[in-house]
């Protein structure tokens, strides 16, 4: 018990621990996608309020404008920027004539370019004000435009970025310096506000004159264009006007304005007039803009935040420190929303449910910034999956930091990442810092000088991974409240580029512009307010101010020079030849746009930001945040095209695809080649490597009868048949719960049922199925190489003269073994007559007619026995590069290609590549080499190993490169094209759906079907139509090939970082492939019963009419009235009986007969429930000692076998029984037969319904009928088995004793073998070891039966004897006397005690000369 004085201490520590947990819980739940809160119990309103109340509003404001650490770091960065501007190689801006009129030279330093040159350039100083830097930025842009060329492009970008950063720093230092001098928070905020209200040169007149008149004329002009029917492209006319602008020079493209400072000042003025000055000067930088919008909120609501304190206030840095979902909760508190975001639902859904019409523009902008900062964070984390380490969005911020430094520095402690081997290995760069064995941990990873140095020195040359590491380093600092990271973020391009993520809607640029026009129309009709004339932070900015200001900012011109909007539109439509901004954005990385054209002028990002805020579809009627979330809602809908929609009817898709391919213009493939990079064709060739030659597989498959069987063994079956049988066996085993348990030992299945009963769980090894097939394939090849003639050629002769075919066999199996984990098998139809021109025409016509009849009356399942099966591997890195480039080409040319036409154009391109491999193929189609694909070099066996591998690849690529490569390409392309894959991957990552992936009947679960049925996605979306032929038409190997389709999909999903979908395909490779094959076989036969089903349907309709009206609809079915008394009233058809439609007992007698047969067929089909191997094999186990005189049964596959017909009979008995009882149920099944089963979408959902409802009723029926008898049979079988084991054990324990006693009493020297002592012991020992014992004990043994539970593991057991009967040993072996003993001795002999008592008796050397039989008897006694 705790003493009294210790109690307060314990309570104190308990409270500390509780507080620690509460503080950590705020970061516990990361919000994926759209910030879904996964753990509502942790972040309850009570817990969150308790935590947030700890933060004082004034302290939070002080952290922004009274923070000494922030002030110090900003000052340090300012000095670093000023120093770098002085030492910059780009000595601009130059001091020219008229420059002094633009800026105050006294606040700048003048520097000569060289000592011998009179030209001077100016650099700002610490005394330069914010307005001075604004003018300085105008000068730099003016002169950069004039001198621009590609050689100095990176230098210009770098200078523009750091000057913009310097301007931001100057603005951030204004309230910090003011508070430091006056120690007054409000006056510091007012000092910041004065920057935008007390402009030095305030213009009295607007650049566009009267605003009302301007917009009135604009709307009249827009209305005129829309009403003019002669104008075809109205959207382009609205943007470009009457002037047709051609592609401009690079400097016109790269900069938003021309080299005119006055025009730049006019842009500043126009944004200032609409209250957008803050956005104009800062740009859409996520950190900087958010910082000042929060300060603007602080000034506007100063009384509520800091005097009354009835609303919570948080600094921008503190908001970013929270988890993704909690950031919105904090924002709701700051914006005084009545409904604070505490829901588990997505932020979009909860935001749109509440009336947000009164929300201020500042809160709308913060909503936008937080939403895309969350997306930026997730994008950075997602991109790490392309590297050697993975992060995930659910990680707490501390763990993200630790995980990052553990990866970069091999230690969670901070280090300078630029000095680590992980960073250096991305490229060979010269390191200007001294080499160190261990990363320097004395200097912080967020050191301002080091990060700025490497940014200026190396950033422009960084690749994707290094740029990612730099931004991820800064992100970890922001998430963990590091002020230095907060300051460093000001110059990182990724925080500007995040605006690009908002252009995800698949709409043309002109359509987005029309939304902006609609916003202006709505504002002009609703109100006519006067503009503010400045960007006073106290002013309320409305949506109308935003729309009008954005329009003017984007459309202002100077001297007939195109506006920003026109430049950007021309760049898209004529430069890049695309119509959608999203097509451009999808090809860019959001954290490294430093290398694209937008980085030449940061105002491009400002233009995109303002244009995005005002171009949402519903912006005219909703505020910015509502319009943004409504736009995202549209993006969430599945992009259902003919390529991506897996429910699209496959016959229509097939014929449409073939039609598009046939009508593709001849020059379209040439155009695609021109759009590709020079080395892409070579990459395409290297994307696949063929390993298992088709002729190699055919030797074990189609030509298996020609192979010599091993001595004493039957001839082997075709390899594809063996593989198909293994899949069928797995399917038969799965319902009994033995799915992939002990896959390496197929004979252990008999014991599994007992393990289940004994609760010894055996976990399934579902991802190991390929190893089973490997053993079967290797066994088939080994048997081939064991043939006598193969041994003579391959093993006993010089390999130099070996047959080409044998060498090809050996190379194929070696390549398969060496690349086992990566090998995939595809197949094609093997129709030999099709490839031989000598085939008579009538035979070809006959085959075609037979195929047509076979397909029309069902489907084409099992039409061919064998297929052409070959193995290959995918070079994932190269293929990913190829697909990324082609996908980018498609996005940039959607005006030329549709998704289907682009796919078929790529297929034709692959056909061209395939033709380049055909140099060694003969021209005549009748050639046997071409028919069986033995088109390798004539001297193939004499080549070295590397050359032979190339021959195999070229041989297979000459026929199957296009089909195989296109299958892999379409998988990746259609996945990237769909906007549903991200959500699908997240759905299968949820705990409730993880079990679907490992389920053996996932195809019958609602989640599997609702989330897209990966089986249908593979067959109807991810793969081309021709890929369905082998998985349907082949009798042997179709399931094996389909499982490899799943494995290819798994690899493709893994390449795109969809880990959950990758695992789903891997785990469902067997179960779903088996289901598909079985479904096709059942569908084929089911459709053959169409005439019979139709006949009974017509008869049923007639009887239904008789039940309802009293007379038959068709008189043929009216029973004769010869003896009406023998027929029930309802059956005679003369009386109405409407209730018989639901249930009738009139045919109960007939139904009972069918129920009887249904019951007995269930006994046969459901025997696996209690007998894992079936009832027959279970009985045979009792006669294993009798050799079975029968032939080996042919392995079963998915076809019409005995079980199939038993199931068919079972189905007939079920139908005849229950259809006769209830006509309503019969009609329900008719609807399924005629409609549901013929539409894949309906059939999949009906399968789920059938499982949970109809099958449930059938299971309950079986439980009270056939299952009872099966259980009784199982119990009886076990009792018989136990009784048999009992007899065996008794006999096994008595047998050695009987033999010894027989030896003792019935010894015949003439017959007895004269065995020596040790031979006899070994003989008895072996006998004891081999009998069946299993350490069983007998219960309720009588006194005379106790010996049954006694065992001796080291010596034989003898009968209980009287001591008087013991034998005595004498020197004469023929004289044996017995002596009576009155007392019994134990039958168990303790050999250890015996050795201790008399070691002489156990000495073999001493007794060596004694006869063996006498020595043995003496040893027993």
Curated annotation (Swiss-Prot):
Signal peptide, first to last residue: 1-24
Residue intervals passing through the bilayer: 1203-1223
UniProt keywords, alphabetically: Cytoplasmic vesicle, Disulfide bond, Host cell membrane, Host cytoplasm, Host membrane, Membrane, Signal, Transmembrane, Transmembrane helix, Transport
Pfam family, one: CLAG
Subunit composition and interactions: Component of the RhopH complex. RhopH complex is at least composed of CLAG3.1/CLAG3.2, RhopH2 and RhopH3 with a 1:1:1 subunit stoichiometry. CLAG3.1/CLAG3.2 mediates subunit association through independent contacts with RhopH2 and RhopH3, which do not directly interact with one another. Interacts with RhopH2. Interacts with RhopH3.
The UniProt record lists the keyword Signal: yes
Membrane topology: Single-pass membrane protein; Peripheral membrane protein
InterPro entries per record: CLAG
Superkingdom to which the source organism belongs: Eukaryota
UniProt-recorded name of the protein: Cytoadherence-linked asexual protein 3.2
Disulfide bond is among the record's keywords: yes
Cellular component terms per the entry's GO annotation: cytoplasmic vesicle; host cell plasma membrane; membrane; rhoptry; symbiont-containing vacuole membrane
Function: Participates in the formation of new permeability pathways in Plasmodium-infected erythrocytes enabling the uptake of nutrients from the blood plasma.
GO biological process, one term: adhesion of symbiont to microvasculature
Annotated region (Disordered), positions in chain: 1371-1413
Coiled coil: none
Compartments it resides in: Host cell membrane; Parasitophorous vacuole membrane; Host cytoplasm; Cytoplasmic vesicle, Secretory vesicle, Rhoptry
Misc remark: Many Plasmodium falciparum strains have two highly similar paralogous genes, CLAG3.1 and CLAG3.2, that are mutually exclusively expressed. Analysis of blood specimens from 20 Plasmodium falciparum-infected symptomatic patients indicates that parasites predominantly express CLAG3.2 in natural malaria infections. CLAG3.1 is preferentially expressed in cultured parasites. CLAG3.1/CLAG3.2 expression patterns can change under different environment conditions.
Gene: CLAG3.2
Disulfide bonds: 335-363, 409-415, 519-547, 523-544, 1352-1355
Biased composition (Acidic residues): 1398-1412
